[in-house]
Amino acid sequence: MQRRHFLKNAAAALAALGLPALPPWALAAKAVGLRRLGQPQPFDYAWLKGQARALAKAPYKSHKQVLPGPLESLNWDQYQSIRYRQDHALWADGNGKFQAKFFHLGLYFHTPVHIYDIVDGKAQQLAYDPAAFDYGRSGLGGKQLPKDLGFAGFRLNTRKDTDRDFSAFLGASYFRAVGKEGQYGQSARGLAIDTGTGGPEEFPDFIAYYLEQPADDSDTVVVYGLLDSPSVSGAYRFAITNGEVLVMDIDSALYPRKAIERLGIGPCTSMYQTGENDRRMDWDWRPEIHDTDGLAMWTGGGEWIWRPLCNPPHLRFNMFVDENPRGFGLLQRDRNFDHYQDDGVFYEKRPCLWVEPKSGWGKGSVQLVEIPTVDETFDNIVAFWNPQAKPQPGQELLMGYRLYWGAHPPASSPLAHCMATRTGLGGIVGQKRSHFSWRFAVDFAGGELAALAKDPKAKVEAVLQVSRGTTEIVSARPLHELKGYRAMFDLVPPDEGTQQIDIRLFLRANGKPLTETWLYQWTPPPASERKIY
């Protein structure tokens, strides 16, 4: 499948997951029992792993279906007008803290998902019921749809706020969640396959979900998922705890059908169009447009790394080799509304997503894929863990990790961290430039920097390395507005070529690092476009 076509559609649909309240006439005062199929059957995670293992032993069969004509022809506005009725919400007739509602098939969603309710250790399939939906302006009201149509996915609400969901699973293996800010942003996936290889990317599907009815006093919803694709099948367990920072405790068991070139564990999918450091696509009236602004990594060796994101002119792939990583994630550090000026999508409220392995993942790499985009409707950033050993048929891969959704990751470096990265034409103002250079201004705050900024005897230096070219006008000076420091330098690229240049920077005093490590990758313009004005 071509990634751009798939993600442009999926991103637009997922962006609207936080739907407004249903109109009063669409609600009923009393909960209505859901229709079910068959008899309850014993269920546990071991049984689900057995189902995934059996799938992997059989030839793959596509789960996508040709939908009835009226569903195939829905446009965006028509599909968005279809709402699940509150009176049919799963667990609405109980006393627990949570409810679940379901998404209708149609538009971009052609793969039916079977959804089961688990009560007292037994699972029973929920039946598609047209009466559970309000069809709005879709034109589907009163039309006969198959009784075995199925669903596209589901969303979770609290009983105290049935209008807004805090997590949603919709499309392929995509899912999202929010922290206390209540604003959706980036997505996670069950699995990424062959992302950034230059060839077609494979998008596995969750083909069944099993929702376990929580105890009345529980703060956690447990969801199981059965995943399938041409290359692999899998069983997943999600323990979702809602709160100021939403936590998903995930166990997955993967069963490859064939060798996989690039397997992505814990994939985060985001969007970066333009920001302080990269204004290649800055024709929009808004100063910055991004779900996240950087990749953070806490390596197995204890190093903290910050890599600002870019919207590159060409597909860009980076690999950060590690062993037993402690965590990584795509973060939105910039929380200032003035930097975005968008009161419709609220980029300053978009959640960070931090991936924390529950055990040693061994050797591999955190991989970052940055894809060119011309607008915000295309999710062009992906980060994931890629095991060094390529999965082989017949193997069982057990991976456990936690996902944290919120304004800040659960772990942070005691050292100062990067607050902003800005770039522009180099040189000295007021003096004629004799050659082309590109300036970088990197702001750090936290750790010991506030105290050092007040000390006139402090000797803070910028430790800088570049893979190509030369640097000049290197400095590190206090920035009192941030109670931190600003490192600045000009990078002079080689005379010819547009080969990417890798940059590494941190601040140091008395031989001791003061900041996390800042990494960057810059693509110099062709020699003919290097204007010095």
From Swiss-Prot:
Main subcellular location: periplasm
- Kindly state which keywords UniProt assigns to this record, in alphabetical order: Periplasm, Signal
The residue range of the signal peptide is 1-28
Where does it reside?
A: Periplasm
Tell me one Pfam family matched here: MdoG
Q: Does the keyword GTP-binding apply?
A: no
Listed pathway(s): Glycan metabolism; osmoregulated periplasmic glucan (OPG) biosynthesis
**Entry's Gene Ontology BP terms:** beta-glucan biosynthetic process
Q: How is it modified after translation?
A: Predicted to be exported by the Tat system. The position of the signal peptide cleavage has not been experimentally proven.
Mention any one GO cellular component term assigned to this protein in its UniProt record: outer membrane-bounded periplasmic space
DNA-binding keyword on record: no
Q: Which domain of life is it from?
A: Bacteria
GO terms for MF: carbohydrate binding; catalytic activity
Show the InterPro entries listed in the entry.
Gal_mutarotase_sf_dom, GH-type_carb-bd, Glucan_biosyn_MdoD, Glucan_biosyn_MdoG/MdoD, Glucan_biosyn_MdoG_C, Ig-like_fold, Ig_E-set, TAT_signal
Q: Which PANTHER family match?
A: GLUCANS BIOSYNTHESIS PROTEIN (PTHR30504), GLUCANS BIOSYNTHESIS PROTEIN D (PTHR30504:SF3)
Purpose of the protein: Probably involved in the control of the structural glucose backbone of osmoregulated periplasmic glucans (OPGs).
Q: Record's HAMAP family?
A: MdoD_OpgD
State the similarity comment: Belongs to the OpgD/OpgG family.
Protein name in UniProt: Glucans biosynthesis protein D
Gene symbol of the encoding locus: opgD
